[in-house]
Curated annotation (Swiss-Prot):
HAMAP family: SHMT. Pathway: One-carbon metabolism; tetrahydrofolate interconversion; Amino-acid biosynthesis; glycine biosynthesis; glycine from L-serine: step 1/1. One of its GO terms (biological process) is glycine biosynthetic process from serine. Its EC number is 2.1.2.1. This is Serine hydroxymethyltransferase.
Length: 417
């Protein structure tokens, strides 16, 4: 028998307890600008840390291979219904363990090994699972990649030309480092011209889509996948969505289970349900509107400070910065900013001469700082401090002065009260 006091983490494993405490301290003392990170609510974390962790539930609600699933069925049913309501669709699979798992399931459902897939190049802002040669999507399938035009927008002419030439079975519209707006209708027209399945990967913008502040893909795409963290502020996990296509929905069900997963993570599914409930509140729309305002506020300052922004600016929550003119690499800038209590990630830019481990760019975003309560004023300050460091990487005085200012700002805006 366990005791919550005797068998607490602190009493059982002080090394892990201390590591977690250090991470809690880091999250409080650092400004989080990684575009794919956010802060989950106490309610989400409470659900994820619940005794649902203990329950095996292979299958789907109402059709399990184990007994004793009547209560976890409630959690999964709520998660599905809330996801459907949030995105206005009639099918949602809440079982994928991650966005990559959701993408893999879609591949398995609609393609055969060797089929051609057209997706955004990783160097242009795509994702590993969109056909990168180092990923399953580029190894099992014949991957063709599109990029950006000279203005930093998706090169739709190239997409159409590649589709006509290679006749892909599936086209992927989505990104991990693109700051523009996707024209879903153009992608639909191109997909229809070659009879391809159109998949949207909305992992980065799902919260914006749900709030109605980013174009809705569902009138145009056959299927959409997303993560449940990032702009949705839920637990780390995946989600598959589609509308008015029961035949495809049936394929997605079996592609997840028994296709690529066994038992679902019921504690995570419960946490997803909580996050979807939070996202259905009117305050979530206000939050997403502020996410966009804060990204634009940083864009304005960074342009004034002479930092080039790929695509010329941002129309969503993220910015991809070309820091070539600073004389420093993305790797150097990421480390310097870390010492100054600003967390970012180095990122390749289009036609980057440096390796992905070094890069010439940085990717930043506004979701986490907006959750923290930052408004435009604070975001302008952060952007100026970021520029100070990026132009002076390795300058101990600049880094220390910046860190002190960031600590003061963080104390005024705690992550959790």
């Amino acid at each position: 028998m366990f005791s919550f006091e005797k068998n607490s983490l602190k009493n059982t494993d002080k090394e892990i307890f201390d590591a977690i405490e250090l991470e809690v301290k880091r999250q409080h003392e650092h400004v989080e600008l990684i575009a794919s990170e956010n802060y989950a609510s106490p309610a989400v974390m409470e659900a994820q840390g619940s005794q649902l962790t203990n329950k095996y539930a292979e299958g789907y609600h109402g059709k399990r291979y184990y007994g004793g699933c009547e209560f976890v069925d409630i959690a999964e049913k709520l998660a599905i219904e809330r996801a459907q309501q949030l995105f206005g669709v009639d099918y949602a699979n809440v079982q994928p363990h991650s966005g990559s798992q959701a993408n893999a399931a879609v591949y398995n459902a609609v393609l055969k090994p060797g089929d051609t897939v057209l997706g955004m190049d990783l160097g242009a802002g795509g994702h590993l699972t969109h056909g990168s040669k180092v990923n399953f999507s580029g190894k099992i399938y014949n991957s063709i990649q599109y990029g950006l035009d000279e203005n930093g927008d998706i090169d739709y002419e190239q997409v159409a030309q590649l589709a006509k030439e290679h006749k892909p079975k599936m086209i992927i519209a989505g990104f991990s480092a693109f700051s523009g707006i996707i024209n879903w209708q153009k992608f639909r027209e191109i997909a229809d011209s070659v009879d391809a399945v159109l998949m949207a990967d909305i992992a980065h913008v799902a919260g914006l889509v749900a709030a109605g502040v980013y174009p809705n893909p569902f009138p145009y795409v056959d299927v959409a996948t997303t993560t449940t963290h990032k702009t949705l502020r839920g637990p780390r996990g995946g989600l598959i969505l589609c509308n008015n296509n029961p035949e495809l929905a049936k394929k997605f069900q079996s592609a997840i289970f028994p296709g690529i997963q066994g038992g679902p993570l019921m504690h995570v599914i419960a946490a997803k349900a909580v996050a979807f409930k939070e996202a259905l509140e009117p305050s979530f729309v206000d939050y997403q509107k502020q996410v966009l305002k804060n990204a634009k506020a940083m864009e304005k300052v960074l342009k004034q400070r002479g930092i080039n922004i790929i695509s010329g600016g941002t129309s969503n929550h993220l910015l991809l910065l070309d820091i070539t003119n600073t004389g420093f690499s993305g790797k150097e800038a990421e480390a310097a900013l870390g010492r100054a209590n600003i967390t970012v990630n180095k990122n390749s830019i289009p036609n980057d001469p440096r390796s992905p481990f070094v890069t010439s760019g940085l990717r930043i975003g506004s979701p986490a700082i907006t959750t923290r309560g930052f408004k435009e004023k604070e975001c302008e300050l952060v952007a100026n401090l970021l520029a100070d460091v990026v132009f002076n990487c390795g300058d101990e005085k600049v880094e220390n002065e910046t860190a002190a200012k960031i600590l003061d700002l963080c104390d005024k805006f705690p992550v959790y009260k």
